[in-house]
Amino acid sequence: MRNTRSPLSLIGMLLVLTIALSACDATKRVPKDRHLLRENLVYVNGSKTDDAKINNFVLQKPNSYILGMPISLYIYNLGNPNAEKDFAQWIDTHPGWHRFLKGLLSEKQVGRLQKSFLVSGIDHQLQRIGEAPAVLDTARVHKSTKQLGAYFRSIGYFNNKVTDSIFTLPKEEKQQAKVSYNITTGERYYLDSLKTKITSPEIDSVYQLHKSKTFLKSGAPYQLSDFSNERSRLYELFRNNGFYTFQQSSINFQIVRDTVAAQKDTKLQVTTDIGDLIERDGDVITTKKYKVHHINKIRLYTDYDNKVDKSTLDSIQYRDMLIYYKDKLRYRPRVLYHATSLRKGAVYSDMERGNTYRQFNNLRVFRYPNMEFKYAANDTLQNKLDANIYLSSMDKFSLRLTNEIKRSEIEAIGFGIGTSFAARNLFRGAETLELNFQGTFASQPTLKDTRFFNTSEVSGDIRLIFPSIVFPLNTRKLIPYYMTPQTILQGGMSYQTNIGLDKRTTSGLLRYVWNPRNQKNKVIFDLINVQYVNNINPGNFFNIYQSTYERLNDIARKYSLGSRYVDSRGNLTPSEGTFNFMNDIFEGTLTIQDEDILPLFGVAERYRRITNNDFIVASSFTYIINSKSQFFDRNFSQLRFKIEGAGSLLNAIAATYKVVNSDGSTKNKLFGVEYAQYAKAEVDFIKHFPVSKQSYLAFRSFLGVAIPYGNSDNIPFSQSYFAGGTTDNRGWKAYRLGPGASGSILDYNEANMKITLNLEYRFPILGALKGALFTDVGNIWNVADDTRFDKYKFKDLSSLKDVGLSTGLGLRYDFNFFVIRLDMGIPTYDPAEPIGDRWIKKFRIKETVFNFGINYPF
């Protein structure tokens, strides 16, 4: 039985705390001659603006409010900032207590006592998790005024005027004030004529070839960011076209405008000025024309040690690269050559330099490489560069061990062990061999097996990774090395004992991975993905899937049945009676009423789907577009496409291996097992929208559908979709929503189509503690398969009325490197209820679903 007291007690405590905090004095820690900043008001040309970009230029922010109260400030005020000083004064004025404590401890320990947790630790903790009062700082107000003026000048309002005003609030809100910033923008300036002044002919020729990509456009409003972007573009352009010594400081923009506001001439004349190279030698400054640099010699040092004399190393020439090594070259020269994007005679390029770093990292056998460029010996013109690449190898072998303690509703206690072994540079081509083993051993008291650890799951896999595309045809033009390609060949097995139906799973995979265009996007191409699932103990089905058993038992209890079917209480025996009951009905030796036939077929269909041995041979293509520019990117977006097909290859190979099933249909088999045939497509989109400096909206949408055809009437259980759970529709537990309006009557409800929409507002509460408000919409349906029940099916857009909608709130504690998450989801619109009764009418805590997870759901 679910315990509802704990959540109710928590809500009661929060309510009491809220009432107590509301009685607090917000200005308790504000000096008497100062004011608490209550609000910033920003007006642009007389109209109030809430534009986050503009408001962010106001340096001082008021304290944060939750439910109309500055709770973080109240918590801070509960702490005494002078706890140590007050304790020292108390000791001085109470000599008796001083003597007692000195006798109990020592004089030094009494002095340290004021820094202890008992004396000042609680106060420090309250102030650490709380928020200090935003005491109005007039210096920061005036600085904010200057920053606002600078911002509007940066977007073309050169004649703007910004003033600030401070308003103290009425006495009932003592020592509180608001600040008003009033901005008059004036006319905006626009770019007019665009000219260039370039002293180096070689620089000018490159500029002219790429000038169409400029950020500066005639007629566009002045934007300082456009000039910054143009400077970065030109710097990258020249550095990637041979100008090794090019300095960003050589790029300047001369902007001429009418400084007399009364003239109202808002056109700007812009000259892009690219000067010469400036070199400093002490106090001597010289200038030189920029010139193109070419790569001369390329030297690569494997297993480099700066303590070893380079002259003692052996070397080998491979194409235009000289490879140095000690004693024995452990890597194929071809692999090292292709990992290097630099080529003799090519112009110097920062991009190729970066590609070389990435490609060596992709080999996974070297630590981060070191690279240096020097002028070639006897190069009096100084336009030839020798490239030296220094590599340091990782350990040939590595071993990692893991362990964990487990507990669940099924398993009383258990432990898991794992080991991972890696062998690098296996065939001298930077290949990596990985061996992984996982074992979980647990105790399940309900089993007849009397051993303490009576359940287990053991799995192992072997993986071979090649740092290139391994394919009979040459793919280098289609997938060059700068896309950091990989080929993964993997095989694995898992073995369950006394868990569910005791599955034995065998899998194999040939996968290609590469990063097109930039390192953010990713392609995953599974040329072949084989999976065989063998259920060893299907007779245990009705012991595991209790909801399905109850449905069948409810049908059986309507009839007078003998010991062949039921026990002394009249219930079907799970191991034998259930199967005898279904078989005898299908064979005609036992009859039931017509109204029970369809539910019985549903149970039989469920049994067949879950106990079927699955044989899947699939191919898939996944493309991921990722905009993430930094680890904490609040403008993050990601779009993932996936298409998958299974069974077509086997259908061509095994066309002659046909069997006739009892229903008269013809199915192909391979190795005695019917193989799956289906087509699958998925689209997943995630987008984050900043709302303020510390809060943002997170949106996710998902659409997936898998259509069986040919050799299959439905898709395998392992390839189906489910709804509910910690990262999906949080008002329902996993597998407890759908399909459609069916009411989720089974233990594990799944289907072959899924639609999900999630919207979540994330905001700060106290320090590392964050909050969230969310809405989840979606469901699963059956489409184009052999499902008999209309409530399960997606027929047309009218079926969208059967989505489930949940709302809720969550708490997250951010440890920087991971997040602990607790979400409380409420089923707000339940498709299982009749039309007209689906919206929640009364909140009940027992219907709330608590979801615990690690990291954000999307």
Predicted regions and their residues:
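Interaction-mediating elements
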Residues: 25-362, 479, 497
